[in-house]
Swiss-Prot record:
PANTHER family: FRATAXIN, FRATAXIN, MITOCHONDRIAL. GO terms for molecular function: ferric iron binding; ferrous iron binding. Involved in iron-sulfur (Fe-S) cluster assembly. May act as a regulator of Fe-S biogenesis. This is Iron-sulfur cluster assembly protein CyaY. Belongs to the frataxin family. It comes from the Bacteria. One of its GO terms (biological process) is iron-sulfur cluster assembly. Keywords: Iron, Metal-binding. Pfam families: Frataxin_Cyay. SUPFAM superfamilies: Frataxin/Nqo15-like. GO terms for cellular component: cytosol.
Amino acid sequence: MNDSEFHRLADTLWLAIEERLDSWDGDSDIDCEINGGVLTLSFENGSKIIINRQEPLHQVWLATKQGGYHFDLKDDEWVCDRSGETFWDLLEQAATQQAGEKVSFR
């Protein structure tokens, strides 16, 4: 994958997160902000989830209260390079914990 393809795929991921949060009807408020390629989810309790792109590695990084995760694109799915879990699974787990209620991105 070249840099422009990586940015296109990351932009698609960012847009999917924004759209899913816009349509989410949970009790908690989750704010989504994009600044310079970094997507920040802010929760009512003051905690944050940071998602950013690592262009040189063509990876997406996810920082949560539970820890940091690095994702490579494999077969059209962002997959953690350590655990093999998908980006969506880990994001849902972290968002659910930080929001204090079930958060789904699917």
